[in-house]
């Protein structure tokens, strides 16, 4: 018998809470895990409840009671067993220990703990599936609960000192617990009156910040529980590899004091002691080490600080050693001793290390980042960022800029309900106060005080902002004034968006004088009382100037048809017009504010971009009549292709070109073309395995299906006025055959992500217009009709949006729907100039009202559950709410989600095993289960072992005289591997293949693939370019083959295996050699050809001799 039953016969109107109270009178308090109260399909005066208990014993009890007559009031109840649980994997608390004393503080040696604060009568609970520890206690008549996730624990030690009546469980952490306080008034709401879910967010517990004096919880890097010596402690080894027991060893707990800077409300932040001055970069790194538990804050003594004196020690040596400390993977309790030993090692080598930082190209900058959580602060970086207009202009003061992100203790986004609880949407918690106060008061690091500057629209979505520390009379206000004139904007949301316009990641190209541009009229109409702008966000660029801009962007093989730009106060797209005589023709819809800046900044351009379906698109196409079998066929084709790349060279070559264009792909294609087999050459095999694994994972988690008959394209306008309403021009390039172009005619599906309304999917007619043949890799829309097609697609425009364009006729739906009305809500206009305090408050309010993810997930769940799919009432209502939420950064009008749109249970493909779940019968459920077993969450890729090194070394890569260059090659590879490994550790990326290809399976929660993939890719490319420049530093061109051969030798030969990244527990990396892939491929082809000719001659000689 299972844990779940159906109890029928309750009167209509009964709530889940009433059912729970009634059943627990028989089974005992806390025995009901989840309840769903539902109406029978035929209706009637009686309802039934599906009830999941914590134990099978309780289900038997209720079924037995019902068999012997069980009444609820006057209602006679029947009970039946149910096969499927409401929650497949409930998080059960199996262990609870009460009456403990808990110390908060820092471990300063393996046997000594310094306490900063302590709590009495603590109750700790944990169990299978929970993946977290709960600590509950009272302080000054308030009830508190700390929730510490397993991911924030890096080591647990149980100390049992001899002759003591207590033993001590020390939990060392790399992150703070979430802190809750209990509401004084009990609240009954959990998941709505018809559902109960015991492990849901108990509304009585409200998130709060560190309530101790000096923020001792946030300063603590370890928690120590004092346990009775006779207490049996559960075995933690199952969940923690770093669990150890120390019997009969000494263990001391001593009183300590706050070690964090008094200049900051944020903790922990350390300052050097009086009389010591550290450069900002070293102080920042030192704080990074303390905050990430690489160093113990109280253990930093004068001796340690003396070793950071760059007048006495080489700066590159200091930087290298501090960087290595970060990557050791453990806390160093004697940092002065460790540093001395490292210095001696390098000095004895007679060759100091190179700087651990990677040399960057123009357009890239190193930026420092600070993450603020409810209880702590984390410094990170410097990390590679694409530059922007402001950073370029103030490049002299780059270290005075700071990126600040507000995240939760698990480093994921703060939830809106943590700032404003569902029980009272008008209320604000202390988390809200903390975010607002940091924006208002700034952050102090050493002698710099960073103050709020601005944020871009993408930063706002990530809860991130820019800060600046005043220097040389330049302040944040000074920078905002330089950016442009915003005084005419009286709406806070729009004002903030215009400030952020200058912070878009971009590359500077050419200067354009005011007499070289023209302002041309917009194309607009009034239709049914609504003003539509067909040219919203788009202008023109002359063909000659476009070619110059392309060259400035480093594009030598083609000149794009359109560029996404920023120019002065203008933003949007400029498309090539062969007839234009002015460099730029801009429209009023592109002008957002006045600015004297005349530099043309480019954000993106039209190019080949592969096309993928996702869950939203599949849902809408399915709603509009595309059959399930079509989607299943498309997914199967992708999976078959991914399987084939591991063994078939031609399949691998084609798949890489279509699905993963880029510099890295060129290396792999070159290896295939020179004869290497996908399943034999270790580097090629590793990269292809990762490519397959990452694409399979995307299929499982996002249903992201590659469509060969489609492209992702930038939207443009037909400036010739040739196209009629309902027509588009679609011309695409072929990545496999550069220079080839193809014009599509016939029906095409056009949509813009995100898309939730069935009307967002447009079926248009692609036509051939010779006057528009210069427009390649973009979709050209007409300027005729009652409404612009881009506006019909999710309320989009032409300022840089990328559209899904598909000409695969199997995916053209048999019917379409009227598009939704995307007229934004009226904006609130102030009676005064917007103040920067109002912008800061708006930022905090955005987090409170950020509901995009909640609405999108709810839409996915309802569309799967409802018979009408995306046409159902809940989905249409959610689509409207989503539009309001999308416009919030422009209007300041929030989307309020009513209770009936909260998700009660999730389809299995959303993979929420700790929530009420059912097996989806619709297309996404089918696709998910078809690929689920082939795409586990983590797919292991074979490491380059000593055995593989012995078998795979290619003698064809040896060139006469390579031995002369081996020592230098070894030094360069050691430097390269150290930097590459540092990047992997910093971003939390496990394998070399992932960071090189961008097919990242899992990364640190500080980062997201969507937001940080470009920066990671640029950092890797910069490292490769730096390494290549070292190869080219000598002018001995005639010996470059021997030098390249040496690079291969120190990478692949078994005698060099395991000699790199000493003491850092890293894999043996292979990519170093392939930084000079063109030279290695040439060597391979030359030696292969020579060997084949020799073999042919030997065979011919054999025939001539022996017949």
Curated annotation (Swiss-Prot):
Q: Which domain of life is it from?
A: Eukaryota
Q: What induces it?
A: By salicylic acid (SA) and infection by a crucifer-infecting tobamovirus (TMV-cg).
| Catalyzed reactions per annotation | RNA(n) + a ribonucleoside 5'-triphosphate = RNA(n+1) + diphosphate
- Going by the record, the broad EC class of this enzyme is transferase
Asked if the keyword Transit peptide belongs to this entry, the reply reads no
Q: Which GO terms describe its biological process?
A: defense response; positive regulation of post-transcriptional gene silencing; response to salicylic acid; response to virus; siRNA processing; wax biosynthetic process
Gene inactivation phenotype reads: Upon viral infection, increased levels of TMV-cg, tobacco rattle virus (TRV) and CMV genomic viral RNAs. Reduced levels of TMV-cg-derived small RNAs and CMV-derived siRNAs.
Concerning Pfam families, the annotation shows: RdRP
The alphabetical list of record keywords is: Nucleotidyltransferase, Plant defense, RNA-binding, RNA-directed RNA polymerase, RNA-mediated gene silencing, Transferase
Query: What GO molecular functions are on record for this protein?
Result: RNA binding; RNA-directed RNA polymerase activity
Query: What's the Enzyme Commission number for this chain?
Result: 2.7.7.48
Which PANTHER family does the UniProt record give?
RNA-DEPENDENT RNA POLYMERASE, RNA-DEPENDENT RNA POLYMERASE 1
Q: What does this protein do?
A: RNA-dependent direct polymerase involved in antiviral silencing. Required for the production of some small RNAs (mainly 21 and some 22 nucleotides) derived from the crucifer-infecting tobamovirus (TMV-cg). Required for turnip mosaic virus (TuMV) silencing and accumulation of viral siRNAs. Involved in cucumber mosaic virus (CMV) silencing. Required for the biogenesis of viral secondary siRNAs, process that follows the production of primary siRNAs derived from viral RNA replication.
Q: Which family does it belong to?
A: Belongs to the RdRP family.
**Name of the molecule in the record:** RNA-dependent RNA polymerase 1
């Amino acid at each position: 018998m299972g844990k779940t039953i159906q109890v029928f016969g309750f009167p209509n109107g009964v709530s889940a809470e009433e059912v729970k109270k009634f059943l627990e009178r028989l089974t005992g308090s806390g025995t009901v895990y989840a309840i769903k109260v539902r109406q029978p399909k035929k209706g009637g005066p009686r309802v039934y409840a599906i009830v999941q208990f914590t134990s099978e014993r309780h289900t038997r009890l209720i079924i037995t009671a019902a068999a012997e007559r069980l009444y609820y009031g006057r209602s006679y109840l029947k009970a039946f067993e149910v096969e499927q649980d409401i929650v497949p994997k409930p998080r059960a608390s199996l262990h609870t220990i009460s009456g403990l004393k808990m110390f908060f503080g820092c471990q300063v040696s393996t046997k000594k703990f310094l306490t900063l604060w302590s709590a009495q009568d603590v109750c700790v609970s944990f169990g299978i599936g929970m993946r977290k520890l709960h600590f509950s206690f009272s302080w000054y008549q308030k009830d508190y609960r700390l929730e510490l996730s397993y991911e924030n624990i890096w080591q647990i030690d149980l100390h049992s000192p001899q002759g003591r009546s207590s033993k001590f469980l020390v939990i060392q952490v790399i992150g703070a617990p979430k802190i809750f306080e209990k509401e004084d008034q009990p609240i009954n709401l959990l998941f709505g009156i018809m559902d109960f879910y015991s492990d849901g967010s108990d509304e009585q517990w409200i998130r709060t910040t560190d309530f101790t004096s000096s923020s001792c919880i946030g300063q603590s890097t370890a928690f120590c529980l004092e346990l009775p010596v006779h207490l049996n402690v559960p075995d933690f080894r199952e969940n923690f590899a770093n669990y150890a027991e120390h019997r009969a060893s000494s263990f001391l707990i001593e009183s300590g004091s706050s070690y964090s800077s008094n200049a900051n409300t944020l903790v922990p932040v350390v300052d050097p002691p009086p009389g010591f001055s550290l450069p900002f970069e070293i102080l920042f790194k030192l704080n990074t080490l303390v905050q990430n538990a690489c160093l113990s804050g109280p253990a930093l003594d004068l001796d340690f600080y003396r070793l950071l004196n760059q007048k006495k020690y080489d700066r590159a040596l200091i930087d290298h050693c501090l960087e290595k400390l970060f990557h050791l993977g453990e806390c160093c309790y004697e940092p002065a001793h460790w540093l001395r030993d490292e210095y001696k090692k390098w000095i004895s080598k007679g060759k100091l290390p190179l700087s651990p930082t990677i040399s960057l190209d123009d357009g890239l900058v190193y930026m420092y980042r600070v993450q603020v959580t409810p209880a702590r602060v984390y410094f990170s970086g410097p990390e590679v960022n694409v530059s922007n207009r402001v950073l370029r202009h103030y490049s002299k003061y780059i270290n005075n800029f700071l990126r600040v992100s507000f995240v939760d203790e698990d480093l994921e986004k703060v939830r809106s309900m943590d700032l404003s609880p569902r029980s009272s949407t008008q209320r604000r918690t202390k988390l809200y106060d903390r975010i607002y106060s940091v924006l208002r008061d700034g952050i102090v690091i050493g002698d710099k005080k960073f103050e709020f500057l601005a944020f871009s629209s993408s930063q706002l979505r990530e809860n991130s902002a820019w800060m600046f520390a005043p220097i040389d009379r330049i302040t944040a206000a000074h920078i905002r004034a330089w950016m442009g004139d915003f005084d005419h904007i009286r709406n806070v949301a729009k004002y903030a968006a215009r400030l952020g316009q200058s912070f878009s990641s971009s590359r500077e190209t050419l200067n354009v004088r005011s007499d070289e541009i023209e302002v041309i009229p917009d194309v607009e109409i009034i239709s049914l009382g609504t003003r539509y702008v067909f040219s919203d966000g788009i202008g023109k660029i002359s063909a000659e100037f476009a070619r110059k801009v392309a060259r400035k962007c480093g594009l030598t093989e083609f000149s794009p048809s359109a560029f996404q730009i920023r120019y002065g106060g203008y933003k949007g797209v400029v498309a090539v017009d062969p007839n234009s005589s002015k460099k730029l023709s801009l429209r009023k819809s592109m002008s957002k504010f006045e600015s004297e800046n005349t530099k043309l900044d480019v954000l993106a351009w039209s190019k080949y971009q592969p096309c993928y379906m996702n869950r939203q698109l599949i849902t809408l196409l399915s709603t509009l009549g595309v059959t399930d079998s079509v989607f299943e066929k498309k997914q199967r084709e992708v999976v078959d292709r991914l399987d084939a790349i591991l063994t078939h060279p031609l399949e691998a070559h084609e798949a890489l070109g279509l699905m993963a264009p880029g510099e890295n792909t060129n290396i792999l294609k070159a290896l295939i073309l020179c004869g290497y087999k996908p399943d034999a050459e270790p580097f090629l095999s590793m990269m292809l395995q990762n490519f397959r694994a990452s694409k399979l994972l995307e299929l499982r988690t996002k249903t992201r299906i590659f469509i060969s008959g489609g492209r992702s394209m930038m939207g443009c306008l037909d400036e010739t006025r040739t196209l009629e309403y309902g027509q588009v021009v679609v011309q695409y390039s072929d990545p496999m055959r550069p220079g080839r172009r193809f014009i599509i005619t016939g029906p095409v599906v056009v949509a813009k992500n995100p898309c939730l309304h069935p009307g967002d999917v447009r079926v248009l007619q692609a036509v051939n217009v010779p006057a528009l043949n210069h427009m390649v890799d973009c979709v050209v829309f007409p300027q005729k009709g009652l409404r612009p097609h881009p506006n019909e697609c999710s309320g989009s425009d032409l300022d840089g949006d990328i559209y899904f364009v598909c000409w695969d006729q199997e995916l053209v739906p048999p019917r379409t729907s009227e598009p939704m009305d995307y007229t934004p809500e009226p904006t609130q206009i102030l009676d005064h100039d917007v103040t920067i305090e109002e912008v800061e408050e708006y930022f905090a309010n955005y987090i409170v009202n950020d509901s995009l993810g909640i609405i999108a997930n709810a839409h996915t769940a309802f569309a799967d559950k409802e018979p009408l799919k995306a046409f159902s009432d809940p989905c249409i209502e959610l689509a409207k709410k989503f539009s309001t939420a999308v416009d919030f950064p422009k209007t300041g009008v929030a989307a309020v989600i009513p209770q009936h749109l909260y998700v009660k249970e999730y389809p299995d493909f959303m993979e929420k095993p700790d929530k009420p779940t059912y097996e989806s019968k619709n297309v996404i459920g089918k696709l998910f289960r078809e690929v689920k077993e082939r795409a586990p969450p983590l797919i292991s890729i074979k490491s380059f072992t000593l055995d593989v090194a012995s078998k795979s070394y290619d003698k064809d890569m040896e060139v006469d005289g390579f031995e002369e260059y081996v020592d230098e090659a070894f030094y360069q590879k050691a430097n390269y591997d150290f930097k590459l490994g540092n990047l992997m550790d910093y971003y939390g990326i496990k394998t070399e293949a992932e960071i090189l290809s961008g097919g990242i399976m899992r990364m640190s929660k500080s980062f997201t693939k969507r937001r940080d993939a470009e920066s990671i890719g640029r950092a890797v490319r910069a490292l490769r370019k730096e390494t290549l420049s070292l190869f080219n530093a000598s002018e001995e061109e005639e010996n470059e083959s021997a030098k390249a051969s040496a690079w291969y030798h120190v990478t692949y030969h078994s005698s060099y295996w395991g000699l790199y990244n000493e003491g850092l527990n890293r894999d043996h990396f292979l990519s170093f050699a392939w930084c000079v892939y063109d030279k290695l491929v040439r060597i391979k082809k030359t030696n292969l050809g020579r060997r084949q000719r020799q073999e042919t001659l030997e065979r011919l000689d054999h025939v001539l001799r022996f017949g």
